[in-house]
């Protein structure tokens, strides 16, 4: 399966890793920069912790970088 591993950076996952994931969470700069985003491949969907969100899928390029809401001018 082909997953995004970074912004506009699709790569073929290693054997045995057939799940793409998008994990997001807030850090100290969340209010000014938005959530931290991690994209990648995994054998199984990562475990969701209380402070982050995880979305998993299993088709090629199904985990693009999330669109961040824009602030009004």
From Swiss-Prot:
<dbReference type="GO" id="GO:0099106">
    <property type="term" value="F:ion channel regulator activity"/>
</dbReference>
<dbReference type="InterPro" id="IPR054131">
    <property type="entry name" value="Toxin_cobra-type"/>
</dbReference>
<feature type="disulfide bond">
    <location>
        <begin position="45"/>
        <end position="56"/>
    </location>
</feature>
<keyword id="KW-0872">Ion channel impairing toxin</keyword>
<protein>
    <recommendedName>
        <fullName>Alpha-elapitoxin-Aa2b</fullName>
    </recommendedName>
</protein>
<dbReference type="InterPro" id="IPR003571">
    <property type="entry name" value="Snake_3FTx"/>
</dbReference>
<feature type="disulfide bond">
    <location>
        <begin position="57"/>
        <end position="62"/>
    </location>
</feature>
<feature type="disulfide bond">
    <location>
        <begin position="13"/>
        <end position="41"/>
    </location>
</feature>
<feature type="disulfide bond">
    <location>
        <begin position="3"/>
        <end position="20"/>
    </location>
</feature>
<feature type="disulfide bond">
    <location>
        <begin position="26"/>
        <end position="30"/>
    </location>
</feature>
<keyword id="KW-0528">Neurotoxin</keyword>
<dbReference type="GO" id="GO:0005576">
    <property type="term" value="C:extracellular region"/>
</dbReference>
<keyword id="KW-0008">Acetylcholine receptor inhibiting toxin</keyword>
<keyword id="KW-0800">Toxin</keyword>
<dbReference type="GO" id="GO:0030550">
    <property type="term" value="F:acetylcholine receptor inhibitor activity"/>
</dbReference>
<comment type="function">
    <text>Binds with high affinity to muscular (alpha-1/CHRNA1) and neuronal (alpha-7/CHRNA7) nicotinic acetylcholine receptor (nAChR) and inhibits acetylcholine from binding to the receptor, thereby impairing neuromuscular and neuronal transmission.</text>
</comment>
<dbReference type="GO" id="GO:0090729">
    <property type="term" value="F:toxin activity"/>
</dbReference>
<keyword id="KW-0629">Postsynaptic neurotoxin</keyword>
<dbReference type="Pfam" id="PF21947">
    <property type="entry name" value="Toxin_cobra-type"/>
</dbReference>
<comment type="similarity">
    <text>Belongs to the three-finger toxin family. Long-chain subfamily. Type II alpha-neurotoxin sub-subfamily.</text>
</comment>
<dbReference type="InterPro" id="IPR018354">
    <property type="entry name" value="Snake_toxin_con_site"/>
</dbReference>
<keyword id="KW-0964">Secreted</keyword>
<keyword id="KW-1015">Disulfide bond</keyword>
<dbReference type="InterPro" id="IPR045860">
    <property type="entry name" value="Snake_toxin-like_sf"/>
</dbReference>
């Amino acid at each position: 399966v082909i997953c995004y591993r970074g912004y506009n950076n699709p790569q073929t996952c290693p054997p045995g890793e057939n799940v793409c994931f998008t994990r997001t969470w807030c850090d100290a700069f969340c209010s000014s920069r938005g959530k931290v985003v991690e994209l990648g491949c995994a054998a199984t969907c990562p475990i969701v912790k209380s402070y982050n969100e995880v979305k998993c899928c299993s088709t090629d390029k199904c985990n693009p970088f999330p669109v961040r809401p824009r602030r009004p001018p």
